Design a protein with these regions (language model features):
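Short, low-complexity disordered leader/linker segments with a strong preference
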Residues: 1-35, 443-446, 450-460
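Short, well-ordered beta-strand elements
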Residues: 30-41, 62-67, 89-90, 140, ...
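Extracytoplasmic "Venus flytrap"
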Residues: 31-51, 413-419
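Extracytoplasmic "Venus flytrap"/periplasmic binding protein-like
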Residues: 55-125, 156, 160-167, 262-263, ...
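Hinge/lid segment of periplasmic solute-binding proteins
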Residues: 96-148, 173, 198-201, 291-305
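Glycine-centered hinge/linker elements that transmit conformational signals in sensory
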Residues: 176-178, 217-245, 290, 294-304
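C-terminal lobe and pocket-closing loops
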Residues: 274-275, 289-293, 308-425
Length: 460
């Protein structure tokens, strides 16, 4: 081979290597590879995710590069990748607020999301889930699963005291007052100023009372009667029926697992812990020593609640989504379709207690995925199928929870505002000030209103 021929061949090889080492693939790139980011960065879940996408590669010969990124790092990583032109093709386990924020910045591909949803069949998804991911009439991402905020209560204590299930503000207040005392808190709920868990807990009660962040025109409405009443209810409830201090996710869960609280507001991620399947958060109530699953057997679960200013029950929850980015390879839609179909039960199996299906089944088998979900193994060091831990009625309520899910801002097209206010958490700060007596509940609502108006002006 001549020197000139050798150099030409070498140059060709180097060019191929350079293309292969590039960032996110463009729309017209026919290379059979995808970059897949996921916010599920727990090592066990990363391993399980790799197994799922390996199945996709075997079926399609499309290679996937899996990158796990902590949820708290997603915003900065996406911003850097967007600036560098190296966006992933697909982003998994992205929250509702985050995908709406990405869409507002032009990072997601609504047409690609619509293609996936239509191919799978819109009728196979929760209608509410589809409506929550829409902006300007188009889906900004494909909803994959949900977790829901729950009010969990001790059925045995309620029965003994003759109390009604805590499905209304009135019933919650009555139970908290009646059961509080002798080392028992009537209820434990988040109260920490700089904690998103406080935001989620308040929003749960707010939407249940008909309180919305904004009206349809986008004006902040935290001083409306339903919102002012929710501030008052939250403060009164924790002052008279709970323990004092800045409660958070860890302390509230610990109190209920120790048998020191009759009610707790927590997410569905606590369900395996109630059954004693996690060594990091085990039930230690007096009865739990003989039966680690005592709390799972003796806890009632409420999803939707009704406040006095509301006309129907409602609840807070979170949707997680698959977002296809604007520069994605054409094969990205195929991957998401696989994850929402053949790979869907395994995806839900990463953490079934916190991954409730929002696609119930297929056109031919309408309940295929909800049925499969009830038999998925949950737990950490120990595992059991959900169906062995909770009765069918509880699982049915959880499986349909997305249908009564209500979220601030998204129905009003204010997804960007929702994301922006989570950066400074003005509502938890106002609540904490009311709980420690610095502000009255009414003044707390006014402070939160003013802070939200400032945030809204800054992003417009």
């Amino acid at each position: 081979m001549s020197t000139r021929t050798f150099l030409a061949a070498l140059l060709a090889v180097l060019l191929l290597i350079a293309v292969g080492c590039g960032g996110g693939a463009g729309k017209n790139d026919n290379s059979r590879s995808l970059i897949f980011w996921t916010a599920e960065d727990n090592p066990d879940r990363v391993k399980a995710t790799q197994a799922i996408i390996n199945r996709f590669t075997l079926q399609t010969n499309i290679k996937i590069k899996l990158v796990a990124i902590g949820e708290d790092q997603l915003q900065s990583q996406i911003a850097s990748a967007s600036a560098a032109g190296t966006l992933p093709d697909v982003l998994a386990a992205a929250s509702l607020g985050f995908v709406h924020s990405l869409a507002a910045d032009g990072i997601t591909d609504p047409d690609a999301a619509a293609t996936v949803i239509n191919a799978l069949g819109r009728q196979t998804f929760s209608r509410r889930a589809l409506s929550l991911v829409e902006a300007s009439g188009k889906p900004v991402a494909v909803p994959s699963d949900s977790w829901t905020q729950l009010l969990i209560y001790r059925k045995d204590l309620f029965t003994k005291a003759g109390l009604a299930a805590p499905t209304t503000f009135e019933a919650i207040r009555a139970a908290a007052t009646t059961l509080s005392g002798s080392g028992m808190a009537g209820i434990v709920a988040a109260a920490k100023a700089d904690d998103s868990f406080t935001q989620q807990t308040f929003e749960y009660l707010a939407v249940a009372n008909g309180c919305q962040l904004t009206n349809q025109a986008g004006a902040i409405t935290l001083t409306s009667k339903p919102c002012r009443d929710t501030f008052q209810f939250y403060v009164d409830l924790l002052r008279t029926g709970s323990v004092q201090g800045a409660q958070d996710a860890t302390s509230t869960r610990a109190a209920y697992l120790a048998g020191k609280a009759a009610m707790v507001i927590w997410s569905s991620f606590v369900l395996d812990e109630l059954a004693g399947l996690s060594n990091d958060a085990r039930p230690i109530c007096p009865q739990c020593r003989a039966d680690p699953s005592f709390l799972a057997k003796n806890s009632g679960i409420v999803t939707a609640i009704t406040g006095p200013d509301a006309t129907q029950p409602s609840q807070f929850g979170e949707l997680t989504c698959f977002a296809i980015t604007k520069d994605a390879n054409n094969d990205a839609a195929k991957l998401v379709q696989f994850l929402m179909n053949d790979g869907y039960p395994a995806w839900l199996g990463l953490a079934p207690e916190g991954k409730v299906p929002v696609r119930t089944g297929t056109s031919d088998q309408p309940t295929k995925f909800t049925s499969a979900w009830t038999h998925l193994e949950t737990g950490v060091e120990h595992t059991k199928p959900l169906s062995q831990l909770y009765p069918p009625g509880v699982l049915k309520v959880l499986a349909t929870s997305a249908d009564t899910m209500n979220r601030w801002g998204f129905p009003q097209g204010q997804g960007r505002l929702v994301g922006a206010q989570l950066a400074t958490l003005p509502i938890p700060k106002a609540l904490a000030a009311a709980l420690n007596g610095t502000l009255s509940p009414a003044a707390a609502a006014e402070q939160a209103q003013a802070d939200l108006e400032t945030i809204k002006q800054s992003i417009n």
